[in-house]
């Protein structure tokens, strides 16, 4: 997981901290905030970056564990730390969202990239025709291309086809809107808007990609998606990490199918 976290920027850590924060349990909000501030004051420091990454990993692994199990592993000094592994966290997210994991062995970065692409594919397929149309048009596709595409593909939306038809930039806009809309569903639209506004100053392409459709999507997904308390944190964290890994265009142009689970509702 460290290879994944070391690719993040200060703004990413701040976003994750907002999701992680909790008034209960073993989370260390104060320590996490202090580590982010220390890294922000000296972003070239390898030691400060690694210390922050280690703390974030610990928090995420804790969130994927039950309090009782975490405490028992903590007092028994379990090798590798008391939390479940990051891969276990993401595997549980795949299961909760009813998405199929990739069959081939892959890195943590590739795993969360696949998660985001499969999630986007499933969610867009579930949208009503008119919402799909708005989403695709907001990604920069012409009305003519959108009409042609949806006429035959509204139930079979696939990112590789979008990349072929409209280019990588359009695919990135679609994924960004869907993922940020989903994160807003879990942490609240007001909080998500505030955090995204901050992120847009660091990553202008995200600011350009996000439109009103992202917040419309937030309202379309039902309470089913909210899952339990832990999943309300591990799902948006995993999706956000996947979005970060795709920021430089690492899309799988072959496929990222949601799998045989079908409609996740």
Regions found by a protein language model. Name each.
Residues 2-7, 11, 19-22, 173-174, ...:
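Anaerobic metallocofactor- and corrinoid-dependent redox/one-carbon enzyme cores
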Residues 1-163, 264:
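Terminal export/targeting leaders at protein ends
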Residues 179-263:
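Membrane-engaging insertion elements
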Residues 124-213, 227:
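Compositionally biased, low-complexity segments of secreted and virulence-associated proteins
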């Amino acid at each position: 997981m460290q290879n994944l976290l070391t690719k993040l920027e200060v703004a990413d850590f701040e976003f994750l901290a907002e999701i992680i924060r909790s008034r209960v349990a073993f989370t260390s909000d104060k320590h996490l905030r202090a580590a982010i501030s220390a890294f922000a004051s000296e972003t070239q420091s390898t030691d400060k970056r690694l210390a922050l990454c280690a703390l974030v990993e610990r928090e995420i692994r804790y969130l994927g564990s039950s309090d009782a199990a975490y405490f028992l592993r903590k007092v028994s000094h379990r090798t590798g730390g008391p939390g479940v592994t990051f891969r276990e966290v993401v595997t549980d997210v795949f299961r909760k969202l009813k998405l199929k994991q990739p069959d081939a062995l892959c890195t943590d970065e590739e795993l969360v990239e696949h998660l985001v692409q499969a999630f986007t594919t499933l969610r867009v397929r579930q949208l009503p025709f008119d919402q799909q149309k708005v989403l695709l048009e907001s990604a920069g596709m012409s009305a003519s291309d959108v009409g042609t595409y949806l006429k035959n593909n509204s139930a079979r939306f696939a990112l590789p086809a979008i990349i072929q038809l409209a280019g990588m930039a359009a695919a990135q806009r679609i994924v960004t809107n869907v993922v940020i809309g989903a994160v807003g569903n879990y942490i609240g639209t007001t909080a998500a808007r505030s955090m995204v506004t901050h992120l847009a100053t660091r990553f202008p392409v995200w600011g350009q990609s996000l439109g009103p459709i992202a917040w419309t999507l937030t309202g379309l997904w039902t309470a089913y998606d909210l899952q339990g308390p832990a999943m309300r944190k591990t799902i948006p964290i995993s999706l956000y990490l996947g979005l970060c890994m795709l920021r430089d265009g690492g899309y799988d142009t072959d496929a990222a199918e949601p799998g045989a689970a079908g409609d996740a509702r």
